Each structure stands twice: as C-alpha cells, then as structure tokens.
Amino acid sequence: ELAKVSLWLESYAEGLPLTFLDHRLIRGDSLTGPFFEDLLTFPVSGEPIDDLFAQQINERLRKTLGEALAHVNDLEASVGKDVADLEQKHTAKKRLDEALSPFRMLAAVWSGCVMLGDRGSDLAYRNLVTTVADQENIDIHKSLQPALQQMSDLGGQNLAYDLVFPEVFRLEGSPERNAGFDSILGNPPWDRIEIDPKQFFGNFDFRVIEAPNDSIRKELIAKLEANVTIASRWSEICGMIDGEERIHDRLFSHQSIAVAGKKTLGRPDTYRLFVERWYQLAKDDCGYTGWIVPSSFHSNEGAAGVRKLYLDNTNLVCCYSFENLKRLFDIDSRQKFAVAVAKKSALGTSSLRAAFYLLNPEWLFAEDKEDRQLVIVRKDLHRLSGAHEAFVEARSNMDLSLIVAQSNSKATDWGDWLVELGISTAFGVELHRNPAFAHVLSESVDTAARFQICQEEGWHRLPLHAGKTISQYTDMFSSVPENFVSTREAFSTRHWKRSVQGYRLAFRMKAASTNERTMIAAMLTPGFVCEQTLAVETDPMKRPNMNALITLGFANSYPFDWQVRQRVTTSLSNYILAAIPIPNIQQTSTFIFHSTLRLTCNHEGYSFLWNEQ
C-alpha cells in the first residue's frame, strides 16, 4: 500500500484517476516460488512427472496463457483515463487471476510439499496435477485431499514469477520461458538464514544471553523448553527454517559449489539467494541486474558460487565497494558493501570495472573516476585468488599492477607451499561452545612464567593462547594467557593430543587491512592450546621445525603482509591466504630461517628448539 501511494504521488496527473497498479505491485515470497518447469517434477522425490501428464499440463497451460495474455492486453489497453476505464481494468485483472488460479494453486502446493520434506505427499500432488490437466474443479478436489490444504497453506506466500507476470516471461502464450525482465534492481536483506537459540530463548529469560558459558546457557534453555508454549513455538520456527532450506536447495544451484574437490563453506545468506534469483529472472543476453549487497559477494568463500555464476554467465559491468564509515546504512561502520551491475550474456565476463574502499556515493556520478577505478581482467582472477576468483581489493591501478606482477612471477602459492612443507592449520577452540577450555587461571603471569609453572606442575593443565597474547615472532604480547583446560579434556578432542607436544606455527584470525600489520604470526611452545582467535598447526610432528620457521619468517615479511592486505576484510582464513604468491626463496631460505629462530627463542620454552637448530 505504501508503494502504491508513493507511485501515485509521483505519477498523479490533474483530472485523471489514480493509476491502476494491482497487476504491477505484487506481494509475495520471492525465494520460495517455483517456475512452471519445476511444477512438472514431484516435490518430494524430485523425479520428473511422466510424459503423459507433462504433455497434458503443457497443453492446458498454453491454452490458459493465451487467455491470460488477452486479459493482460485488456489491462494495458488504456492509461485509465476515467472511472469506466478503471472498472474495465478491475474486471480484466479478475479474469486474469481466475485464468491462472489453477496454476498458482499448483505452485503453492508444490512449494509447500517441498518444504514439508518427507511429510509431503507426491501422490497428493500427482492427483492435483491430474485435476489441473483435466480442468476439474480444484476447490472440490482440495476438500477431498486434506494434505493439499496443509501444503497450500505452507507455500501460499510464494511468488511464482512466470505465473504472476506471464506477459514478461511467456511471450505469445508459450509454455516455455522465453523472456524475462529487462532490468532488475534490488537491495535485498543481508541476514543469515538461521535462528540463534540464544536470541530466541533470551526473549523469555535474559539470563540466556548473559550466561557466562555454553553449559549454563544450555541448562537455562532446557528449563524454558519445559514450557509447552515456548517449546511449541521453537519447534515451529525450526520447522519453518528447515522448510525454507529444503526449497532453497531445490530452487537454487549456485549457493555452494565444489572447488578443488571441496564444497564451499557457509550457510546461505539471504542476499546470495536473491542474487541468483535475479539472474534467473533477467532476460537472456540482454537483461540487466543492479544491486547493493555486502562486500562478501566479491570476497568471501561462501559467495564463490554466485560470483562464478555471474562471471560465467553475465557481463559483470562494475563492482564498486564502499566502507560504511559515513553510516550510509544502519550497520557496523566496519562492514563494507558493494554496488554491482551485470548484463546477462552467454559470453560471460572478460573484464570489469571495480573500485574499493570508497566513502562517498557521489563518486559514482563523477565524470572522472580514473583516480580509483580499476579494470580487473577475468583471466587474472584465477591467478590472483585461485578457483574461488575473489576480487583483490587494490586501491589503485599501480597496486593492481604490482599484485598481478607478483603473481605472474611466483614460484608457488601459500596453499601449495604449506602442503609441500607438511604444514596444516585449523582454528582454535570456541570457548563458549567448549566450557572445559574456559577455566580461569588464578595467577596472571606472562607466557614465559606460565611455561615454567606448568612444567613444574607436570602439565596436568594446558594454558590457552589467544590472538591478543601473541605478536610477530613472540608469544608474549600485551595480554597474558587467562584460561586453561585439563590435559585429559584437551587430549580427548580434536588434534590436541598429537599437536600440543610440538612447536607450532600460529597466526591471528582477527585482522584488518587498516591495522599496522595484518599478518601476525608466531611459533608457539609445546603445552599451549589455542582459542578460536588463532589458527594453529595440527600436525607439527610430521615436518621438521625448520619448515615452520621459514614459513613464519616469510609470513611476517612486508611483501607477504602487503598481499594479505589486498584480500582481507575483518578476518583471515586459509581460503584468503591460499592463493597469495610465494617467490623463489631458495637462496635466502637459510637467512630467513636463522633470523626467525633468533627472533623467536625468547624464553626457556624455546630452549629445545634453539639447541635442536
């Protein structure tokens, strides 16, 4: 209704009635609506409906669409110059809805059935398809099939675009989609498709949010779940989320892709679903899409699928990334967002215009953009970022040229380098999920003193390092280890039993390109475990310590750090680091190793390493 009022205020002409907009402004769920070809598959099994039914339903659709498009023509016959004209439009809209009603009902039932999963019924859906194909009365049939009502209610909010806008997608009444929108604009939600138990149950008891650890939180939640009303609501919400995930998995195929044999990580963000939906809705070879999305579209591993979709199947015209320091959006000032435009094209993207770390939206309308605008060549993306093809965030064309030159002259990259040297890393422990690792140390002493204490005690407990306890080449920084875990508890989880006995390379996970240094790495002594703010080696006994020391020295170097800064947003990961180029350092490896050893061995915990090397 607000959209109508806004358009009426813009388009009002004195002496004419308000424009008829009922067939233009549609309310519905853009992410759960199927296309007509989806309706010819069984919602539960996913198998195609046999040819006989498919042929009947296609013939029925062709006939109905011909009628529907005639009603659309009636709707567009005039601008609505008087009350009689508007009445004619209302009548034409009613006839259009009646003509397409069977197929919209079919779409609602199909979506609902997919969302129900194993509780859905392919048989009930098949019976409904038969009814539609035979032009029987659907309302009567629905009353005979109670399961259909549940499916219809669940999927009733979906927006089946080609059945709502037949004049856009099915020219000349064709049952096949042969067109689409000329242009699509959007600023989609940026939320994750999940619900946080802490937030939900915190609405009923604020102590759930304030709980000091996961164990206490689980106890509080268990008490709340004893309330039938709360438990029922929680079950309903979880079922709704599960249903949405099922239909998204069915309708979208580029949310997660295989890269080097591994699926890209991350639960789908809502914006990624919209980005893929817009591609589906745009007209082949000439439809434009334009949107504002988080900068993760061009940088994150989880967005690799939709990023590749657009690079392969559209001409990605531009991608301009902004910092939110001026609070253009009511989000964290550190979060970045991107304005992107693409034109659907079978030729894909050969190059695109890009800019990063922009602040003022006025820059978009400047005549001269050469001070910040880059031209990123598609063939360079794989070389710079690997198969994920993330965009490097260079600030100038000179920076971009240097990044490309370093990549062209590399001997290997970080990912292959680690494999060659036998180094593997993983995140540390999330304390809120692992309360056994969150015991508080009573004494506040530095790492060197902590090593001595634990050695004297026989290492029956293991202290935790965090990002704030290390800096480059040192495990003693501004903060001291604050937590510990019993050795028995630590050895029963993950890699700690085999890894904690060795000297291990570790680096901070939280890092930004605006920090004094972005890559912060150190060698940890035996006996210490790590929380999630550090990535740490998992199998140090499989490689000589010299390999880790050389890697540490190179990781803390200025050239490597500069490359990291062109890629990082707010945190590091193996995904971001993997494609960073490594030059041939064979002639300098001894110097790097020797210098790193001297910078690292700063207390008794490194005595064995010093003597060994």
Go through each PLM region and give its residues.
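Short, polar loop/linker segments at the starts of domains and inter-domain junctions
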Residues: L40-G46, L123-V129, S478-V485
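Short, intrinsically disordered, low-complexity segments enriched in Ser/Thr and Pro
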Residues: Q55-R62, Q135-H141, K497, Y503
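S-adenosyl-L-methionine
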Residues: L2, S6, L16, F20-L39, ...
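Nucleic-acid modification enzymes, centered on SAM-dependent nucleic-acid methyltransferases
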Residues: A13, P17, I26-G28, G66-Y161, ...
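A substrate-engagement module of RecA-like helicase motors
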Residues: V44-Q56
